[in-house]
């Protein structure tokens, strides 16, 4: 047996899709029950493939319903499951209307707003008008939970509210940006782009990540690809900033212009690369490795040129990180 258990210290990404589904408790399990549950879910969630549409739920057994992730929740599967679990099975119109009136009063109360917003989101488009009342509240919690639910329902008016709250309330930032990233409306793109000019370093990088999740092929976030990492430059009028990712993706994101590497003395980038300031805006980058020819590159002090030079002599992500820490 050549298989051995192990732990990937830096984490990893599975190359195989995991099934997503609901298990019906054994005392309630039946073909009729699983069919009714999947029917109620599909009444709320439909997906479109080219010219056809289909539900997200499929009753596979008497006690198991398989789910596909709706596109609106591609960045937040846990919320998707929270919403799925709040769908009421076989609810008639009169009962739903009564429940919505009760949920509206709870939505406008900060202590119960989060749960009420999720339940209204589970109802779907019929609950939009009530959530729109929520974003008119003077309370930021009520505003946020209402806007978040509206965002996952694809309503454009959620975007300006989430943009403002991501900037002004740290506690809402991640959830607001994640909701914006899942929206297809241009107002969400405008909001994310606006947040990339924020004075907050966390907000700026969070907005960059949201834009990448929304559209990795966008010219704003596509970057320059080197072996093992990606370098991004974001034109920004805010203060210059460099972000070196320590998780998920090997990437360097530079906000602003004019960032230079000007070491006062010789610095090391890893164990084999030396960077020397030659003066007059020039750097000499040298790589010495046993058993290999010495490699050299001359660059300007502009950060982008330095990154390119380190890559040219054989350096990678860790060497560039060392350079930035030492410079």
Please place each PLM-identified region on the residue numbering.
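Extracytoplasmic/periplasmic terminal helices and flexible tails
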Residues: 1-106, 111, 115, 144, ...
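Extracytoplasmic/secreted envelope proteins and their assembly/folding machinery
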Residues: 34-38, 42, 62, 77-85, ...
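Sec-exported extracytoplasmic/periplasmic mature domains
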Residues: 42, 46, 85, 89, ...
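Amphipathic alpha-helical polymerization modules
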Residues: 53-56, 315-318, 325
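Amphipathic alpha-helical scaffolding segments comprising HEAT/armadillo-like alpha-solenoid repeats
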Residues: 93-105, 125-136, 155-167, 185-197, ...
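Short inter-helical turns and helix N-cap capping residues of alpha-solenoid HEAT/ARM repeat scaffolds
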Residues: 109, 138-139, 168-171, 199-200
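Structural detector for internal amphipathic alpha-helices that build alpha-solenoid repeat scaffolds
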Residues: 113-123, 133-134, 143-155, 164, ...
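Long, low-hydrophobicity ectodomains and other hydrophilic envelope-associated domains
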Residues: 219-316, 323-324
């Amino acid at each position: 047996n050549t298989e051995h258990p192990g732990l990937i210290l830096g984490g990893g990404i599975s190359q195989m899709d995991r099934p997503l589904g609901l298990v019906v408790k054994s005392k309630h399990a039946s073909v009729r029950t699983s069919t009714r549950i999947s029917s109620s879910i599909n009444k709320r969630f439909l997906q479109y493939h080219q010219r056809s549409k289909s539900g997200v739920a499929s009753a596979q057994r008497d006690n198991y319903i398989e789910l596909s992730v709706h596109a609106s929740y591609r960045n937040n599967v846990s919320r998707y499951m929270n919403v799925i679990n709040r769908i009421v099975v076989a609810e008639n119109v009169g009962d739903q209307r009564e429940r919505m009136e009760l949920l509206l009063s709870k939505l406008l109360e900060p202590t119960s707003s989060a749960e009420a917003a999720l339940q209204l989101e589970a109802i779907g488009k019929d609950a939009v008008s009530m959530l729109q009342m929520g974003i008119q509240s003077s309370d930021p919690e009520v505003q946020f939970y209402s806007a978040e639910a509206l965002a996952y329902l694809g309503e454009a008016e959620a975007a300006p509210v989430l943009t403002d709250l991501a900037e002004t309330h740290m506690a809402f930032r991640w959830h607001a940006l994640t909701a914006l990233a899942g929206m297809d409306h241009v107002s969400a793109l405008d909001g994310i782009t606006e947040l990339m000019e924020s004075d907050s370093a966390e907000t700026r990088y969070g907005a960059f990540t949201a834009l990448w999740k929304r559209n990795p092929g966008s010219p704003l976030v596509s970057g320059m690809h080197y072996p093992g990492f990606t370098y991004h430059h974001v034109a920004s009028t805010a203060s210059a900033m460099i972000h070196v990712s320590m998780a998920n993706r090997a990437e360097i994101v530079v906000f602003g212009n004019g960032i230079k590497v000007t070491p006062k003395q010789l610095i090391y980038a890893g164990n084999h690369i030396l960077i020397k300031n030659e003066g007059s805006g020039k750097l000499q980058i040298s790589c010495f490795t046993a058993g290999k020819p010495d490699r050299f590159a001359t660059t300007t002090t502009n950060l982008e040129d330095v990154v390119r030079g380190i890559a040219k002599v054989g350096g990678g992500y860790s060497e560039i990180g060392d350079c930035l820490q030492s410079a």
